[in-house]
């Protein structure tokens, strides 16, 4: 069974909940990443010169919005065509340049899900989590393919 209309709607609704507090949720997202992988700090230009995740940082917020938006867009692609095609062909080379490895994708996935759970509150469910996981896994597979 392919990605359903309901799954896409769940992703879209929780993405909107995430965006309602973009500054706070962005800090939360990168805090979760650094909690699991402190060495990843150097991969992000907006983090490498700070001891802690900076508050109200436009670059940090823009990158978080881009990451979550790419996963949301992947859900839409999965619903429409059943496959994820990268709109930005440079994503693979950027990830290679930054030294991203397979374990980093796992850390980001966990941080993304934890952030969405916090943002979604009572609306979070296994069904919402599963929809995001499928979309994220397909996006990360497309990025990894572009990295090789």
Swiss-Prot record:
GO terms assigned for molecular function: heme binding; metal ion binding; oxygen binding; oxygen carrier activity
Tissue expression from the record: Stem nodules.
Domain Globin: 2-148
Swiss-Prot/TrEMBL keywords: Cytoplasm, Heme, Iron, Metal-binding, Nitration, Nitrogen fixation, Nodulation, Nucleus, Oxygen transport, Phosphoprotein, Transport
Compartments where found: Cytoplasm, Cytosol; Nucleus
Location, primary (coarse class): cytoplasm
A Pfam family of this chain: Globin
Modified residues (Phosphoserine): 45
UniProt-annotated binding residues for O2: 63
SUPFAM superfamilies on file: Globin-like
InterPro entries: Globin, Globin-like_sf, Globin/Proto, Leghaemoglobin-like, Leghaemoglobin_Fe_BS
Coiled coil: none
GO cellular component: cytosol; nucleus
Record PTM: Nitrated in effective nodules and particularly in hypoxic conditions; this mechanism may play a protective role in the symbiosis by buffering toxic peroxynitrite NO(2)(-). Nitration level decrease during nodule senescence.
Modified residues (Nitrated tyrosine): 30, 136
GO biological process, one term: nodulation
Record flagged with keyword Transport: yes
Binding sites annotated in the UniProt record for heme b: 45, 66, 95, 98
Family: Belongs to the plant globin family.
Record text on subunit structure and interactions: Monomer.
Known role: Leghemoglobin that reversibly binds oxygen O(2) through a pentacoordinated heme iron. In stem nodules, facilitates the diffusion of oxygen to the bacteroids while preventing the bacterial nitrogenase from being inactivated by buffering dioxygen, nitric oxide and carbon monoxide, and promoting the formation of reactive oxygen species (ROS, e.g. H(2)O(2)). This role is essential for symbiotic nitrogen fixation (SNF).
Protein name: Leghemoglobin 3
Primary gene name: GLB3
């Amino acid at each position: 069974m392919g990605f359903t209309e309901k799954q896409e709607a769940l992703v879209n609704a929780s993405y909107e909940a995430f965006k309602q507090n973009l500054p706070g949720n962005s800090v939360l997202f990168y805090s979760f990443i650094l909690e699991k992988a402190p060495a990843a700090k150097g991969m992000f230009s907006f983090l490498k010169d700070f001891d802690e995740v900076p508050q109200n940082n436009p670059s940090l917020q823009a990158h978080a919005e881009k990451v979550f938006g790419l996963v949301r867009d992947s859900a839409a692609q999965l619903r429409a065509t059943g496959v994820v095609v990268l709109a930005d062909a440079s994503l693979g080379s950027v990830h290679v340049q930054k030294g991203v490895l397979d374990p980093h994708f796992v850390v980001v996935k966990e941080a993304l899900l934890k952030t969405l759970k916090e943002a979604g509150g009572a609306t979070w469910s296994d069904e919402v989590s599963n929809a995001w996981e499928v979309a994220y896994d397909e996006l990360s597979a497309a990025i990894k393919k572009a990295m090789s």
